Amino acid sequence: MGGVCPKIKSIFRRNGDDFMIIVIDNYDSFTYNLVHYIGEFEQDIKVIRNDEMSVPEIMDNNPSKIVISPGPCTPKEAGISVELIKTAEVPILGVCLGHQAIGAAFGGNIIKAPEVFHGKTSSIDHDGSLLFSEIEKSYDVVRYHSLIIDMKTLPSELNVTATLSDDKEIIMAVEHINRPIYGVQFHPESIDTNNGTKLIENFIKKI
């Protein structure tokens, strides 16, 4: 959950091949931090606001992968994010609000977190999912959110791949059981998140 950045514009840079990443911007100030991290590994990026195009119009762009950004709202208010998760047949990474949208897309409840986190550093433990390849099993991440996916209503289609180190009931990452859909509650694009660049690299190069 970040602040609103109302004048973000779409960018589209071709690099001579057919690989292209679409970033769904949920009107968040962190979106272009995320784009910057993605740009370290793939320069062909298109940023589309969550109410700028329909899902069919987005898919007509033939994205290779989709990243759904953080945002200051709930999944229900995140434009086409939830519908896109349900229907797109390409790898998806959801960050913060994007992660919550994954939970909502498959029927999970999105509930208030035990406390509001704004720039808080927490330790997480992960299970070795491909998204966390070559990353130590416990490490520190930065969190900006007031909502979480409810562990008690976690959809059967999703596996938990990371939790807080000190509270295993707080979901920090999920993965779909048979589709390349991944969500992280924390902000890999924050400078104070360890291994954030590596996580983005894993999504782009290994998934």
Enumerate the predicted regions with their spans:
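Short amphipathic alpha-helix with an adjacent loop that forms part of the alpha/beta core around
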Residues: 54-62
